[in-house]
A protein has these predicted regions:
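Conserved catalytic cores of phosphodiester-cleaving nucleases, focusing on short active-site segments
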Residues: 83-84, 145-166, 179
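DEDD superfamily 3′-5′ metal-dependent exonuclease/proofreading module
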Residues: 2-7, 15-17, 153, 158, ...
Length: 260
């Protein structure tokens, strides 16, 4: 049963744990690093980008929300996780329901609205899925991460990142560039275009311009300059490396069975 359970884990989840059936112990890796291979760990792209200098808007936001900052960020993180999980199920052809098997709501109104917006994008533009939530890495530059969606649109290979934030940040461009380079190195997938599916956009509906992809409350922001953004990412990585010369994981160990 345990082996069956391990088999249904996503590939990127497997990169964050070690399972020892003989000791009946499972070790979860912290969220800052990925396991590339036995004894080899790379920092995550999102962790590296936390070392990107924050602008005045961020400093002002921290002053405004004060002690509520942690709560707000955790709540936003939970919403983003729910939207990403639902989006992955949708692109794989599964049905997503607002209610669980017991008739209880699984999602808040805000989360469900964002899921519906993503579904509208996918149903309207019908991208050809190549992969979703794919573990990517770069042995040359020593980082790893999870790419949201790789697909074909209009004959081009796109890397798409789903964002549920209230605003769009420059770090997102660098994140996409790092994933694009990681896909090329680890999966031999050449990315032609990158884009952000922003599910809290202020758009009022479809655009009359043919090259603009958007709907009510959502928009595909097309991000160019992969090479330039990757150079910026490497600069941020240098800042990260100064503060973290050794990427050593922190494990949380738990038994696989318990009895009281």
């Amino acid at each position: 049963m345990i082996k069956q359970g391990m088999n249904i884990l996503k590939e990127n989840e497997k990169k964050r744990l070690d399972f020892n059936p003989e000791l009946k112990q499972i070790n979860f890796l912290d969220r800052r690093v990925y396991k590339r291979s036995e004894g080899v760990y790379y920092p995550s792209v999102t962790t590296i980008l936390q070392y990107m200098p924050k602008n005045k808007f961020f400093e002002g936001w921290l002053k405004d929300v004060g002690h509520n900052a942690d709560y707000i960020m955790k709540k936003a993180g939970k919403e983003g996780t729910q939207v990403h999980e639902a989006a992955e199920r949708l692109v794989l052809g599964e049905e997503v329901s607002w209610m669980d098997d017991y008739g209880n709501a699984k999602y808040s109104q805000i989360v469900w609205e964002m899921i519906l917006k993503f579904a509208e994008f996918w149903k309207t533009y019908k991208p050809e899925l190549i992969s979703s939530e794919d573990f990517v890495w770069s042995d040359e530059h020593k980082y790893a991460g999870t790419a949201d969606i790789v697909c074909k649109m209009n004959g081009e290979t796109w890397l798409l990142d789903i964002k549920t934030s209230n605003s769009i940040h420059k770090s997102y461009d660098l994140q996409l560039a790092a994933y694009a380079k990681g896909l090329e190195e680890s999966k031999d997938i050449k990315i032609d275009r990158t884009g952000i599916i922003w599910l809290k956009a202020h758009s009022r509906g479809p655009s009359k311009q043919k090259n603009v992809i958007q709907g009510k409350g959502w928009k595909l922001l097309q991000i160019d300059e992969i090479e330039k953004n990757f150079e910026l990412f490497k600069m941020i990585y240098n800042l990260y490396s100064l503060e973290n010369p050794n990427t050593e994981p922190i494990y949380n160990s738990y038994p696989t069975t318990i009895k009281v």
